[in-house]
Curated annotation (Swiss-Prot):
Chief location category: cytoplasm
Name of the protein in question: D-ribose pyranase
Example GO biological process: D-ribose catabolic process
Taxon lineage: Bacteria, Bacillati, Chloroflexota, Chloroflexia, Chloroflexales
Cell location: Cytoplasm
UniProt organism field: Chloroflexus aggregans (strain MD-66 / DSM 9485)
Gene name, Swiss-Prot/TrEMBL: rbsD
Length: 131
């Protein structure tokens, strides 16, 4: 049995396979996921699991070089933006429009769907390297 925080085997495999610059999207329950993009659906019901908790666990094993969020996140859901900043304190953030974020989902290695019901509660984590 694994000793680290992340127990989900699908997420563990995804993180282990990431290369420098690969993107993983962690999204709210309503984020549209392109059919060609791998979907890892963790949503159980409204609010479970929450986005920030999901980011916390994924970031515990993933080397994150930068994070992208929608400009609308800070405007409509500042507590999500603030929470992401606390979880990823040494990570640079870039803001893009919500439409650009949705378009970037097509280039992501996977979209992780959470049960989050907060508007614009989505983040793209860009993989870094540990050396």
């Amino acid at each position: 049995m694994k000793k680290t925080l992340l127990l989900n085997s699908v997420l563990s495999e995804l993180i282990a396979s990431l290369g420098h610059g690969d993107m993983v999207v962690i999204g709210d329950a309503g984020l549209p996921i392109p059919p060609e993009t791998r979907r890892i659906d963790l949503a159980l019901c409204r609010g479970i699991p929450p986005l920030l908790e999901t980011v916390r666990v994924i970031a515990s094993e993933m080397q994150v070089e930068k994070a992208l969020i929608a400009t609308e996140t800070g405007q409509r859901s500042p507590h999500i933006r603030d929470g992401l900043g606390q979880l990823l304190p040494n990570t640079p953030f870039e803001e893009v429009s919500h439409e650009q974020l949705k378009a970037l989902c097509r280039q992501a290695r996977a979209v992780v769907r959470t049960g989050e019901y907060t508007p614009y509660a989505n983040v793209i984590l860009v993989a870094g390297v540990v050396f």
